[in-house]
């Protein structure tokens, strides 16, 4: 019996009048993973395309894999030296025994020696990242399925993207219950309340992170959360620049100064998926060439960031080191690159019109640098900049449409 035949045999049980009718969204979600729905348009004019919402979301999901895998490796790369800086051999064994992450990693064969290999670092990072991602995926999927069953519509695959994006923009040390709470806020409050996929005006992943930032700031900001070593305190390079300028950039665990190339490659502490600009750009290129993301938004963000950073460089300041940060450092520090490629380009919460996309992107770039520089107490400005621009996206589209209407009327 072929798979397609099995799916067709099960279909009557889930369609109207079947015993499992109320669970049709679950059947439809599973069936369309393997086969395109057999729906046709009712009108004569229609457009045929090989890509649909499911495949678009899966493309974005795969596009973040380079940043995800590097992020897992980097968690181990930052954690093991930090543990050796804090503890001797006997103390380290006791710490490993008292921490379930370390215990699981050791059971999987991870070496905690100072010369541990890349596989040990990758595995250790996976032990921190995968529980967060699995928690977020299950909880986010639960809300998606629940709302689909209650509203009697198909399950949208948006939670595939929302879940992995959310898991990649939080620290590796985030408690699992807070991860569940954050994704619940993002999916329910920022998306489903407004009608679900395609109707939300805020990015759900960023809304969930913003909720955690204001509700539980100690677990998602500060110096204690970015390196997954018990008792270790180390600021991110962005925070270091905010307090002491470019000369203050140093890897706290190793004492080695942080170069621009270190930041570009991702050899720095930070949120799991935001550290490697190189991997982010590789994934971003995939969704740009796949036409899932708009190059106009990306270009607008870069233009706004470069112009604003250059302006602050020219103005200068004797008291605020952030005025001196060049645009190419803004690009590789914090969540700028990840936000630009994967958050700002969200086709639902961004502007729809071509001219609106330019304005939307420029606003994000300007606001990110403005928040970073003018408010050094909160050096990471990309999250708030994108959420702020989400609110203005409908206005940009409205102004573009009204301008087109006036122009056409003036033609006679």
UniProtKB/Swiss-Prot annotation:
HAMAP family: NqrB. The keyword Cell membrane applies. Its cofactor is FMN. The chain crosses the membrane at residues 57-77, 127-147, 163-183, 270-290, 297-317, 322-342, 358-378, 381-401. The keyword Cell wall biogenesis/degradation does not apply. It is found in: Cell inner membrane. GO terms for molecular function: FMN binding; oxidoreductase activity, acting on NAD(P)H, quinone or similar compound as acceptor. Its EC number is 7.2.1.1. NQR complex catalyzes the reduction of ubiquinone-1 to ubiquinol by two successive reactions, coupled with the transport of Na(+) ions from the cytoplasm to the periplasm. NqrA to NqrE are probably involved in the second step, the conversion of ubisemiquinone to ubiquinol. It comes from Klebsiella pneumoniae (strain 342). Composed of six subunits; NqrA, NqrB, NqrC, NqrD, NqrE and NqrF. It is an enzyme of class 7 (translocase). Belongs to the NqrB/RnfD family. This is Na(+)-translocating NADH-quinone reductase subunit B. One of its GO terms (biological process) is transmembrane transport. The modification FMN phosphoryl threonine is found at residue 236. GO terms for cellular component: plasma membrane. Keywords: Cell inner membrane, Cell membrane, Flavoprotein, FMN, Ion transport, Membrane, NAD, Phosphoprotein, Sodium, Sodium transport, Translocase, Transmembrane, Transmembrane helix, Transport, Ubiquinone. InterPro entries: NqrB, NqrB/RnfD. It is a multi-pass membrane protein. It catalyses: a ubiquinone + n Na(+)(in) + NADH + H(+) = a ubiquinol + n Na(+)(out) + NAD(+).
């Amino acid at each position: 019996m072929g798979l397609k035949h099995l799916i067709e045999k099960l279909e009557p049980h889930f369609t109207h009048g079947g015993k499992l009718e109320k669970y049709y969204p679950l059947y439809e979600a599973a069936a369309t993973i393997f086969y395109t729905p057999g729906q046709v348009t009712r009108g004569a004019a229609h457009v045929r395309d090989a890509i649909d919402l499911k495949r678009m979301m899966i493309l974005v999901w795969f596009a973040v894999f380079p940043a995800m895998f590097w992020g897992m490796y980097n968690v181990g790369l930052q954690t093991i030296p930090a543990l050796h800086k804090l503890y001797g051999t006997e103390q380290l064994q006791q710490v490993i025994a008292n921490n379930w992450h370390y215990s699981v990693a050791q059971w999987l064969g991870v070496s905690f020696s100072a010369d541990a290999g890349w596989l040990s670092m990758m595995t250790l990072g996976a032990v921190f990242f995968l529980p967060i991602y699995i928690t977020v995926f299950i909880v986010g999927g639960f809300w998606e399925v629940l709302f689909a069953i209650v509203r009697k519509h198909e399950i949208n695959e948006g939670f595939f993207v929302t879940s992995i994006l959310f898991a990649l923009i939080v620290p590796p040390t985030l408690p699992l219950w807070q991860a569940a709470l954050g994704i619940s806020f993002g999916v329910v409050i920022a998306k489903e309340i407004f009608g679900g996929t395609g109707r939300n005006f805020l990015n759900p992943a960023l809304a969930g992170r913003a909720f955690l930032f204001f509700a539980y700031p100690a677990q998602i900001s500060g110096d204690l959360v970015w390196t997954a070593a018990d008792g270790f305190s180390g600021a991110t390079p962005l925070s270091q620049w905010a307090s002491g300028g470019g000369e203050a950039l140093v890897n706290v665990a190793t004492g080695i100064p942080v170069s621009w190339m270190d930041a570009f490659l991702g050899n720095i502490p930070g949120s799991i998926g935001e550290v490697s600009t190189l991997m982010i750009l590789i994934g971003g290129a995939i969704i740009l060439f796949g036409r899932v993301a708009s190059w106009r938004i990306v270009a607008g963000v870069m233009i706004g960031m470069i112009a604003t950073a250059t302006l602050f460089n020219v103005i200068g300041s004797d008291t605020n080191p952030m005025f001196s940060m060049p645009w190419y450092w803004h690009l590789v520090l914090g969540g700028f690159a990840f936000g630009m490629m994967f958050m700002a380009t969200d086709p639902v919460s961004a502007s729809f019109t071509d001219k609106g996309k330019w304005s939307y992107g420029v606003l994000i770039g300007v606001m990110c640098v403005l928040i970073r520089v003018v408010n050094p107490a909160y050096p990471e400005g990309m999250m708030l900049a994108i959420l702020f621009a989400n609110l203005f996206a409908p206005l940009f589209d409205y102004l573009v449409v009204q301008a087109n209407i006036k122009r056409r009327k003036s033609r006679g």
